[in-house]
Curated annotation (Swiss-Prot):
Signal peptide: none annotated. Odorant receptor. Belongs to the G-protein coupled receptor 1 family. One of its GO terms (cellular component) is plasma membrane. This is Olfactory receptor 13H1. Residues 47-54, 121-139, 217-236, 292-308 are cytoplasmic. The keyword Disulfide bond applies. It is a multi-pass membrane protein.
């Protein structure tokens, strides 16, 4: 933040689930289960991919990065949401709130771009299998991942550094965590530039990658149709369908949050929508993308045999 940002507010009150006290225990239990599943599932995938040389392939390189992103993304907000469930003073200082906003934004943006890179990898693998190892070589994979991370950091820095927020007393955030939209809603400054930048950034990090992913899966579906075996087609469609479902939940919920005017924003609705891309998909990704694969099951058996 610029040094000339003068505010009358130094901490924020995060409402979280406190305006629904009857749901507090249920919410705490669900978030705890989701967070532990996120840690175990993604942490185990990172370990397994590093441990087994047979998983040192392009797709698992992408999946290990996705698992790392999901692990960090879940950790950026869920532990705080758990602590604040039963806290009598669920306050967060302005620097911590801004830091959480920056970290969550960078991780989410990187994941949006990484999912598009993974879709490209699958298209190459299915449409051009003979040249797959040539097209998706090590440097190309590293470049795609580095571009995802680099672009997310640059865009996040642009959005955060462009904030010139003056808070005139209101400090109640109706959310489970600090997000850039939550801060903008509280300010008494003119936020038209910030809203415009968020919209443009969302087009390049949400709408375009999601469109690319959908087109990629259409190409994959056309390739699957040419499979002669009915059982093979059904299995491929089931796999692609589950992948596409999770991707749609992630992109769709984020698009519904960030690509609308603030006048059409409903805080109670928005904070529960954020659970889909901030908590649910980080838990589901290792289950959908990795743990059902034969290579992963084989690697798990290998680990279990070594332990015995």
């Amino acid at each position: 933040m610029a040094m000339d940002n003068v505010t009358a507010v130094f901490q924020f009150l995060l409402i979280g689930i406190s305006n629904y006290p009857q749901w507090r225990d249920t919410f705490f239990t669900l978030v705890l289960i989701i967070y532990l599943s996120t840690l175990l599932g993604n942490g185990f995938m990172i370990f397994l991919i590093h441990f087994d040389p047979n998983l040192h392939t392009p797709i698992y390189f992408f999946l290990s990065n996705l698992s790392f992103l999901d692990l960090c993304y879940g950790t950026a907000s869920m532990p705080q949401a758990l602590v604040h469930c039963f806290s009598t003073h669920p306050y967060l200082s302005y620097p911590r709130c801004l830091a959480q906003t920056s970290v969550s934004l960078a991780l989410a943006t990187a994941e949006c771009l990484l999912l598009a890179a993974m879709a490209y990898d699958r298209v190459v693998a299915i449409s051009n299998p003979l040249r797959y190892s040539v097209v998706m070589n090590g440097p190309v994979c590293v470049c795609l991942v580095a571009t995802s991370w680099g672009t997310s950091l640059v865009l996040t820095a642009m959005l955060i550094l462009s904030l010139r927020l003056h808070f005139c007393g209101a400090n109640v955030i109706n959310h489970f965590a600090c997000e850039i939209l939550s801060l903008i809603k509280l300010t008494c400054s003119d936020t038209s530039l910030n809203e415009f930048m968020i919209l443009i950034t969302s087009i390049f990090t949400l709408l375009l990658p999601f469109g690319f992913v959908l087109l990629s899966y259409i190409r994959i579906a056309m390739a699957i149709i040419r499979i002669r075996s009915l059982q093979g087609r059904l299995k491929a469609f089931t796999t692609c369908g589950s992948h596409l479902t999770v991707v749609t939940i992630f992109y769709g919920s984020a698009i519904s949050m960030y690509m609308k005017t603030q006048s059409k924003s409903y805080p109670d609705q928005d904070k529960f929508i954020s659970v889909f891309y901030g908590a649910l998909t980080p838990m589901l990704n290792p289950l959908i993308y990795s743990l059902r694969k034969k290579d992963v099951k084989r690697a798990i058996r290998k680990v279990m045999l070594k332990r015995t």
